[in-house]
Amino acid sequence: PRLLACLLTLGPLALNLGAAEQTRKPNVLFIAIDDLRDWVTYFGRNAQTRTPNLDRIAARGVAFSRAYCAAPVCNPSRAALMSGLRPATSGVYDNNNDWRTVLPEDLMLTAAFRRAGYLVCGAGKIYHESFSRRSEWDDYLDKEKKEPDPAPGQSLGVGGIRFAPLDCRDDELVDWKITDYGIRELGKRHDRPFFLAVGLHKPHMPWNVPRKYYDLFPLDQIVLPPHLANDLDDVPAAGRRMAKPEGDHAQMLATGRWKEAVQGYLAAIAYTDMNLGRLLDALEQSPERDNTIVCLWSDHGWHLGEKSHWRKFALWEEATRSTHIWIVPGLTKPGAICSQP
């Protein structure tokens, strides 16, 4: 909800502050990243992660160190962000709720920009993909190619936690094609301001990315996230049911592959960071560079064994904290960090 309000107010503010230099409303580059927790270099929350391009984006604007999602689940988080209505208002609480039945098209962020005269276009995962409403967009990349499979006989992960290095090129994954769409749009000269949404899938599972990204994180150097074996001892029954320690975490301990899973998540983040670098390069070369607001966000965080829990679907810090950066030319202070929730 706060993000929606910011987008609808910062645009006019930026226009007014820079009226002498600007000839029209500022553009918006709206970058969504799936399942990215706060393992970004500039926060220092994980010494192993490698996010030089996220750091580049943060260095140009303001990063929010205590940004939290509306719900630690893809569908309700994204529906809340795009509508400005919290799950308690919309009734969209899980991935099976069709938000389109309760959130009319003219309520959404895309509609606000279209009413303001913007070209509204996008690619990738902005809404949860079980439900989509393409009529909200002037243009959208619909066809995403199939990704390569791991080699025959290769382990696919542990239970539902899926990860495997791939022997393929960077451009064989869907996120490359999504990023290409954003690069093309940034390179065009548009006859009206644009709202360009780029939704990257990684580091959502499966953490199947080219092997070279796994090689950045040698297994013998992987450090597990902070955890206590008895961390759930003082948690009430409802919290234990939320953690499900007998599920993913029990399998991870039984197989001894916890470090491999952490390696896979770090590798998927590194692959995403590479695509962010490509997108940022295109923005810096764009004729609209100095008149484009950048809003980068992730839909929620992710547990990798903290409190014996994996995935999101929990109300602890690791699942609810998200990555969030703004660049507003003429307004944000480069390299600033806001620690207010």
Language model features with spans:
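Bacterial N-terminal signal peptides that target proteins for export
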Residues: 1-7
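Formylglycine-dependent sulfatase
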Residues: 8, 12, 17-341
